[in-house]
Design a protein with these regions (language model features):
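Glycan-recognition surfaces
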Residues: 279-295, 299-304, 370-474
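Glycine-rich, aromatic-flanked loop segments that form ligand/cofactor-binding clefts
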Residues: 160-175, 217-220, 244-291, 387-392, ...
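Hydrophobic faces of well-ordered beta-strands that scaffold small-molecule active sites
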Residues: 184-190, 218-220, 263-267, 325-327, ...
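Active-site-adjacent "subsite" loops/lids of carbohydrate-active enzymes
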Residues: 185, 192-196, 262-319
């Protein structure tokens, strides 16, 4: 059990310390002093467990020109919080990841760190000291005597994005789950378009239209299962198809496959509904209640729960020929994280952990989740080889989860293009080498096409998930989807595999840019923001105007003779011209949600 460490008076105490790249690493509890290793040129400190059950360490630097602090669970709150403003947060395999970055006004790092404690629970807080003028990060861990936690400190001065990608790769397992090609194709999801009102005929008709629009994957969300009605989760736990909605689920899956789409289904295996048949046998393993959902949360520390989850997931895939699963609500297991530092306002109320010894009992919830997910991976690999898809969503999308999931999705933000952009870019920093999916896209079907397009343009740097009833959309909207998905497919590897530059996190990433040896794509999300361009060596630059303005301002590093091809939100060409763009700012007319293709030409 994590010892109480809530007295803020002790946060800035002295202790055994060392300095790594200008960051002071201080042990605040009794035990061996931190040790600097030779790894990565001396950028890794080791901290060993001591006599005290809880090991507390502080990382701190002078504030300097700090403007914000990024961490995986930042959400909208990216300001410089004082140490008394932030609570302790439990992080582990099922929730977030132990890394973060303090950055300056140029989005360059002042303090960036990561630890290798990715599975077991770590309690974390951060903030600036009003008396010290320093920014601190505190990590509290249960380390056994001799057990070691490695803390990597990045060299300061590099861009926060490059630094975080490097730290995430350091944390990532070498045995990550491969991503089948279907995981990198535009996706149709039934959630916002149908919610629980799904049935075989409707989804089969929608699949035809999704395939025609350019999707390669369909995700059947909540509502396919028995008891999947009423908007809550009171029926979760049985995981059998609703025979009224899907009389022959295996035949239905075959119909979807006939359209050329891969097919995944939603499952929330840790939720035990109050009306489920499974409740009679499993209620004793689910003490944490979610009355607003009509269910309890199964505790994965029990062997019986782990076996139930693995069997439920594997049986669903194998019995019906599915290509994978969207596994939801794994973060609900955080209710069973040990300790006394649950963040104020967390909906997952801590549950007492004084569990009697039992066969297969694993005290740490992160470790239990790892065992459970490893078993599931093994079962699916035995059945399907490496060609299966597992979607996880924020916040259980840290580097350690790459061993068990290969589609990582931004958490729910219906119709909020800004949130979808920010969440998916945050996620891409944590998992730079896997398939990052947007949250499902929805919009007002009666809105002009250029307004609807804003949802898709916000997430061009991800694999987009569409969730609108395609048959009900006006022709302009269908044309818009077809045009932009075609644009995306033609640049898929550039958009989803190239390192995206997006500016400062606290400015919510106003401009996303990605470049390879031949092409560049810049998506402008904020009016009156310059679009820097260097056309040297490029055969094409695409500038996407994802704003309400009818103009974009390019900022060229060199004057260039170019051909401009300008299209509207539906892909209709409205202007072609040859012109010379001068060094520095140049204003170019591009309609809202429109595209400007810039092709350098050689003058003779």
């Amino acid at each position: 059990m994590m010892a109480p460490l809530t007295d803020r008076r002790h946060l800035w105490n002295d202790g055994s310390a060392l300095e790594v790249h200008g960051v002071v690493v201080t042990r605040l509890t009794p035990g061996p002093a931190p040790v600097l290793t030779a790894e990565l040129g001396g950028g890794v400190a080791e901290l060993a467990g001591g006599a005290d059950q809880t090991t507390l360490v502080r990382l701190d630097v002078p504030l300097g020109g700090a403007v914000g602090y990024w961490h995986p669970a930042a959400g909208w709150d990216r300001h410089l919080a004082a140490d008394w403003m932030t609570g302790w947060r439990a992080i582990g395999l099922a929730d977030s990841a132990p890394l973060g970055c303090l950055y300056d006004g140029s989005a360059n790092t002042l303090l960036a760190y990561a630890t290798d404690r990715l599975v077991a629970t770590t309690h974390l807080k951060f903030g600036l000291g009003e008396r010290t003028g320093r920014f601190g990060i505190w990590l509290a861990m249960d380390l056994e005597p001799g057990e070691v936690c490695r803390i990597r400190i990045a060299e300061p001065g590099r861009s926060h994005a490059d630094t975080l990608r490097e730290l995430a790769r350091w944390q990532s397992p070498e045995t990550g789950l491969p991503v089948p090609d279907a995981g990198r194709t535009p996706t149709y999801s039934t959630w916002y378009s149908y919610h629980q009102d799904v049935n075989a005929a409707a989804i089969e008709a929608e699949a035809e239209l999704a395939a025609e629009a350019g999707c390669g994957l369909l995700i059947l969300d909540d509502g396919w299962q028995r008891g999947g009605t009423g908007g809550g989760y009171s029926g979760c736990g049985d995981w059998e198809p609703d025979a009224d909605k899907f009389p022959d689920f295996a035949a239905h899956v075959a119909e979807i496959h006939a359209t050329g789409l891969k097919y995944m289904a939603w499952i929330a295996p840790l939720l035990l509904g109050q009306d489920s048949a499974a409740r009679a046998a499993l209620a004793g393993f689910a003490p944490h209640a979610r009355p607003e959902w009509g269910c309890h949360v199964l505790d994965p520390r029990h062997a019986e729960v782990r076996a139930f989850v693995v069997d439920s997931c594997a049986r669903l895939v194998q019995s019906y020929g599915l290509d994978g699963l969207k596994i939801d609500f794994l973060d609900s297991a955080s209710a069973y994280a040990s300790g006394t530092h649950a963040e104020a306002g967390n909906t997952a109320d801590p549950v007492p952990t004084g569990e009697p010894a039992a066969e297969g009992w694993i005290p740490d919830v992160g470790t239990a989740m790892r065992v459970m997910l490893a078993a599931l991976r093994g079962r699916l690999h035995a059945a399907l080889g490496t060609d299966f898809l597992i979607e996880f969503r924020q916040p259980y999308t840290g580097p350690a989860m790459l061993e068990y999931g290969n589609l990582l999705r931004a958490s729910d933000c219906p119709a909020d293009a800004v949130a979808n952009r920010v969440k998916s870019l945050d996620l891409a920093l944590l998992a730079p080498d896997v398939a990052i999916h947007s949250d499902m896209l929805m919009w007002d079907a009666s809105a002009p096409a250029e307004q609807a397009a804003r949802q898709l343009l916000a997430v061009l740097h991800t694999i987009p998930q569409i969730s609108m009833r395609l048959a009900d959309l006006p022709a302009e909207h269908r044309a818009m989807i077809a045009f932009w998905l075609g644009f995306w497919r033609d640049r898929r590897d550039l958009l989803t595999r190239g390192p995206v530059l997006a500016g400062r996190p606290d400015e919510l990433y106003p401009l996303t840019t990605v470049t390879d040896a031949e092409r560049a794509v810049a998506v402008l999300h904020t009016v009156n923001h310059l679009v820097p361009l260097d056309l040297s060596g490029l055969r094409e630059a695409a500038v996407v105007n994802a704003t309400d303005s009818g103009r974009v301002v390019l900022d060229l590093r060199h004057q260039s003779a170019v051909r401009l091809t300008v299209s509207d939100a539906c892909g209709r060409t409205i202007r072609e011209e040859h012109t010379r763009l001068a060094l520095g700012p140049s204003s170019v007319a591009v309609p809202p949600s429109g595209l400007c293709l810039i092709t350098p030409i050689t003058e003779v």
